[in-house]
Regions:
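N-terminal Rossmann NAD(P)H-binding glycine-rich loop of SDR-like oxidoreductase domains
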Residues: 2-24
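N-terminal Rossmann-fold cofactor-binding loop
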Residues: 28-33, 39-40
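Conserved Rossmann-fold cofactor-binding substructure of NAD(P)-dependent oxidoreductases
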Residues: 38-54
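Glycine-/Pro-rich loop/turn segments that contact NAD(P) or position catalytic residues
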Residues: 59-140, 147
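Glycine/proline-rich active-site loop of Rossmann-fold NAD(P)-dependent oxidoreductases
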Residues: 125-129, 162-172, 233-237, 265
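Substrate-positioning beta->alpha
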Residues: 141-161, 171, 182
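Terminal hydrophobic/aromatic helix or amphipathic segment near a protein terminus
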Residues: 190-233
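Amphipathic terminal alpha-helices
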Residues: 246-265
Length: 265
């Protein structure tokens, strides 16, 4: 049995589907929605589904640092006899943009662990979907700064491999797409796929910050804007890890869009 936290999100949902297709007994966990309802900020709510679990996928929300303690959740996993944990972290930990406290809790747990460090998500483009549907317009900061956006499906498939195969124990994987792409280029890809013109507006950092603060804590907003606007070389580099684990190249932004074009029509 494999337990998936954050099971309703852009990574959790395809991860549940991938594992189920592989014949695994999957227990989806989220703060609301289908499956077992639990909150990592209240680790005891997770305990009822851990008996007999061979692995757990841990996904924390952006505000988790202010609300919870991952060491406490890891303690519940350890007490429940869970042997393996896979943590969805961030490329920003490796480039010292984000704190390593969650990774430290996992690597010091005494469990088998694998850490996934994805870069910019292709699915962040969902944030433009409503304005594209209703106004054929989108806005983004740093219009011509390119990052190798990763398809959440690739993250899910790498996570599935790590959850099932102990050969991935004590590994840290940086997950990116196959090529860097800027917001302006993403807009062009969406426009071409829809077959209709899309008006692109470049936001200032201050404008983007004001919007992001409505759904993300300030430290996360600032570090995210730093990555988007002034990425370090490592943050713009294409990682070989998706292909290393899956035996195939990572999906392109166009691949992701093709599967999700309905959201933009």
């Amino acid at each position: 049995m494999i337990v998936i936290t954050g099971a309703t999100g852009n990574v959790g949902r395809p991860l549940v589907q991938t594992l189920s297709a592989l014949g695994e007994d999957v227990v989806p966990v989220s703060r609301s929605g289908a499956g077992h309802q639990a909150d990592l900020t209240q680790p005891e709510t997770l305990r009822p589904v851990l008996h007999g679990a061979k692995a757990v996928f841990l996904l924390t929300s952006p505000d988790f640092l202010a609300r919870g303690n991952l060491q406490e959740a890891i303690g519940v996993l350890r007490e429940s006899g869970v042997p393996r944990v896979v943590l969805l972290s961030s490329q920003g930990v490796g480039t010292h943009r984000h704190p390593s406290i969650h990774e430290d809790a996992v690597t010091g747990s005494g469990l088998e662990w694998t850490i996934l460090r994805p870069g910019n998500f292709a699915s962040n483009a969902f944030g433009w979907a409503e304005s594209i549907r209703t106004q054929r317009a989108m806005a983004a900061p740093f219009a011509d700064v390119a990052l190798p956006a990763v398809d959440p499906q690739d993250i899910a498939e790498v996570a599935a491999a790590a959850l099932r195969d102990p050969a991935h124990a004590n590994a840290i994987y940086t997950l990116t797409g196959p090529a860097a792409i800027s917001p302006r280029q993403q807009a062009q890809v969406i426009q071409d796929a829809l077959g209709t013109a899309i008006q692109f507006t470049e936001l200032t950092r201050a404008q983007a910050r004001a919007t992001m603060l409505t759904f993300m804590p300030e430290p996360v907003v600032e570090s995210t804007l730093d990555i988007l606007g002034t990425p370090r070389p490592a943050e713009q580099a294409v990682s070989p890890d998706v292909e290393k684990v899956l035996g195939r190249p990572p999906h392109t932004f166009t691949d992701w869009l093709t599967r999700n074009l309905h959201a933009f029509r």
